[in-house]
């Protein structure tokens, strides 16, 4: 069945965002090689550096909070996860020089992936014109970093950009500058675009679920001191936080659905699905299937995992599982391991106002998402 379905054809809306010849616009052999390089950039050795980087970003983020206050955390996590993704993927040198221009360019690319782009990503629309201009400028900015690094090739950076620059295809040729830039953007989308929504929902559910959040906070207080360094190894020792995040991912998965384009007629249980059609599965709906998740709207981090393969698919599954799933979980745990020992949180608005926004493929809460924070004694 997988041979009759195409990911690349279904996700052509990403081509003007990532650039020509990148991922879903690359020939199958090159796409496979690019995805392998992307996986290599998110392997254990690099993630050891990333956990410390994320902890440092959280330190900087909360430095001006004071003892108490209110914030729209949908907006706050958009900014924080852009900083963490940029720092991890492009390195400290770029993060230190990161300007408001970069943020605006990146968000222009994000807006280029709205639902209409999956109908025709090249129609005459102001949002698509802004997307195209943003890609050209981002290619120039990231290209400048690549040129600097090539001029000082003796320095080791330990970030994703270094891995992308060292990556090769099966014939030994290296990625072009625009292919490297496209991989950076694609990986940033994986590390930021979806993670900001997950982080917002995690903090919102922590404010909602007081009994569970108390258990999570106790676990973190026991393992970490505020001044202690958060490491990849220590992040493996917080099962209650991990279970909490996994339940957030069940109720509020990063993507509402996954799509494929049918490239050869399929007879599915007696129903003909013709070539050229787009098919989709709803992760949001699958995670509410009562056959696998009794009382599905109840938030329960300790609910038994279903025995059925692919009943729980926040990052997809099988050979096409999201390459950044381990990075995403590490990032969530690092953020909250650094944040929760410092502050406790509560909802500002009535509980029912915190809802999923199902109008886009990437799931986030309907904004604003206001929470009140108080510094722990």
Predicted regions and their residues:
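Cytochrome P450 catalytic domain signature, combining two hallmark sequence patches
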Residues: 1-16, 293-294, 307
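Cytochrome P450 catalytic-domain helical core, especially the substrate-recognition surface
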Residues: 8-90, 98-148, 165-167, 178, ...
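Conserved, non-catalytic sequence blocks in retroelement Pol enzymes and Pol-derived host proteins
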Residues: 44-47, 151-154, 232-239, 322-324, ...
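Central I-helix of cytochrome P450 enzymes
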Residues: 81, 85, 135-145, 167-222, ...
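Proline-centered turn/helix-capping motifs that create local helix->coil transitions or kinks
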Residues: 93-94, 111-117, 146-158, 173, ...
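Conserved cytochrome P450 K-helix E-x-x-R motif and the immediately C-terminal K′/meander segment
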Residues: 140, 144, 228-269, 290
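Cytochrome P450 heme-binding "Cys pocket" and the immediately downstream C-terminal segment
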Residues: 210-212, 325-362
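Conserved cytochrome P450 K-helix/beta-meander segment immediately N-terminal to the heme-binding cysteine loop
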Residues: 281-306
């Amino acid at each position: 069945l997988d041979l009759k379905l195409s990911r690349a054809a279904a996700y052509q809306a990403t081509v003007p965002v990532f650039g020509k010849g990148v991922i879903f616009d690359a020939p199958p052999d090159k796409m496979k090689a690019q995805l392998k390089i992307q996986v290599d950039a998110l392997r254990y050795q690099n993630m050891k550096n990333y956990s410390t980087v994320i902890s440092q970003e959280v330190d900087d983020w909360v430095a001006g909070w004071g003892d108490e206050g209110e914030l729209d955390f949908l907006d706050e996590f958009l900014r924080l996860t852009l900083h963490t993704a940029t720092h991890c993927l492009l390195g400290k040198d770029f993060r230190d020089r990161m300007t408001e221009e970069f943020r605006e360019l990146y968000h222009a690319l994000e807006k280029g992936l709205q639902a209409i782009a999956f109908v025709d990503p090249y129609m005459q629309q102001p949002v698509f014109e802004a997307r195209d201009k943003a890609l050209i400028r981002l290619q120039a900015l990231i290209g400048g970093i690549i040129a600097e690094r090539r001029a000082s090739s003796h320095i080791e950076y330990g970030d994703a950009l270094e891995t992308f620059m060292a990556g090769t295809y099966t014939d030994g040729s290296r990625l072009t500058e625009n292919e490297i830039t496209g991989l950076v953007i694609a990986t940033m989308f994986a590390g930021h675009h979806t993670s900001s929504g997950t982080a917002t929902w995690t903090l919102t559910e922590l404010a909602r679920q007081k009994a569970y959040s108390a258990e999570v906070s106790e676990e973190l207080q026991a393992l970490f001191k505020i001044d202690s360094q958060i490491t990849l190894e220590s992040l493996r020792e917080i099962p209650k936080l991990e279970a909490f995040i996994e339940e957030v991912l069940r109720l509020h998965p990063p993507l509402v659905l996954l799509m494929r384009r049918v490239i050869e007629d399929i007879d599915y249980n007696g129903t003909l699905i013709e070539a050229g059609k787009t098919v989709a599965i709803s992760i949001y709906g699958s995670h509410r299937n009562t056959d696998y998740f009794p009382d599905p709207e109840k938030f329960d981090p300790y609910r038994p995992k279903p025995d059925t393969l692919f009943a729980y698919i926040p990052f997809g599954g099988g050979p096409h599982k999201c390459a950044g799933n381990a990075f995403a979980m590490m990032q969530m745990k690092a953020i909250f391991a650094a944040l929760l020992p410092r502050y406790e949180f509560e909802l500002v608005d009535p509980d029912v106002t915190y809802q999923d926004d199902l109008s886009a493929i990437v799931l986030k809460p309907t904004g604003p998402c206001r929470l009140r924070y108080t510094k722990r004694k």
